[in-house]
C-alpha cells in the first residue's frame, strides 16, 4: 500500500495531472480539494500522508491552509506546487511548514522526487 496523497488545487486539469503523476509513482490519491478551507477539512477527514498544495486559490490560500493544517498536525508533510516561484513566497511557504516547493510548470520527475523526499 503506497502512501496516501491529498491533492489541493483550484484548477481541475492540474489536479488531474498531479493525480496521474502520483498514481504512476506508486502513491495513492486519498482525495482532492479545490481551495484552502476544503483542504483543511479533507486533511482532518482523510488524514493523508502527504499533501500537494497550490498557493493561489479562492476562499483560503495555500499559505493559510498550511498554517491551519500544521496546527492540526505539526508533522504534516506538505509539498507546495505553485506558479508563484518568487523567493518571498517560497520562504513564506517553508516558514508556514511546507517541506518542499515545486514551481509550475513542473516536470513529473520533480513531483516524484519531492514525494519520495518527504515520505522518507
Swiss-Prot record:
Q: Which GO terms describe its molecular function?
A: metal ion binding
Gene3D superfamilies the UniProt entry points to: 3.40.50.2300
* Classification via InterPro entries: CheY-like_superfamily, Sig_transdc_resp-reg_receiver, ST_Response_Regulator
Question: SMART domains from the entry?
Answer: REC
Question: Which cellular component, as a GO term, is one annotated location?
Answer: cytoplasm
- Function according to Swiss-Prot or TrEMBL: Involved in the transmission of sensory signals from the chemoreceptors to the flagellar motors. CheY seems to regulate the clockwise (CW) rotation.
**What is the official name of this protein in its record?**
Chemotaxis protein CheY
Q: Which gene encodes it?
A: cheY
